[in-house]
Amino acid sequence: MTPLNDALYRYVMNTRKLHTDDTPVKVLAPGLKKTKTGRIWTYVRDDRNAGSSSPPAVWFAYSPNRQGKHPEQHLRPFRGILQADAFTGYDRLFSAEREGGALTEVACCAHARRKIHDVYISSKSAMAEEALKRISELYAIEDEIRGLPESERLAVRQQRSKALLTSLHEWMVEKNGTLSKKSRLGEAFSYVLNQWDALCYYRDDGLAEADNNTAERALRAVCLGKKNSYDLCQILSPKRPYAAPGASLYRGL
């Protein structure tokens, strides 16, 4: 399967935008009676939301831990937009010192929204509810333009989303100043504000997405099948200390 895997790896990396995420997986190592925790990483090429007719595809890789060197290795040939969560292991990918140049960081609005939503569910905070309402207005626009060409998506975002994002930022900065930084809502708002530029990148690029749900969906099959992953991960990487194109899970969408 190696030639097929290598071909898919090249195809997935040969694009302008990728979605990435990871999940823990228990690994039954040869000769040991107990399991260790490894990681499954996903890299998704899928531009259908921006009107692309290119086939989507997913490349998965296994690593024995969550160190940032693994995505660095996986993404060595990639140049472009990387949509991901705020995991610090990705930081060097966005550095100008990265070999081949820095990748463009795009954060996940859904991840940021989830933190605020969790606060609202537990506290029914009016401030959290208002934040969710404002974010839902942005998502309503994304629903309208899903599948349109990049240029049309960008035009709509500039005409409608830009002002909403500016208003949200001003409102959140003001309200965050009234909150304890140790409160759950204060932590959620600070999380959003600390990533603001990366969260808003999609406003200025019709190819980018507002969130990283594409990668999260790709990992669902792994999460549902973790019991079957013990032996699979053992087979994938019995002798390799790091994941590589020849030591991966892969599939198309």
Name each model feature, range by range:
Residues 1-253:
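Catalytic center-proximal scaffold of phosphoryl-transfer enzymes
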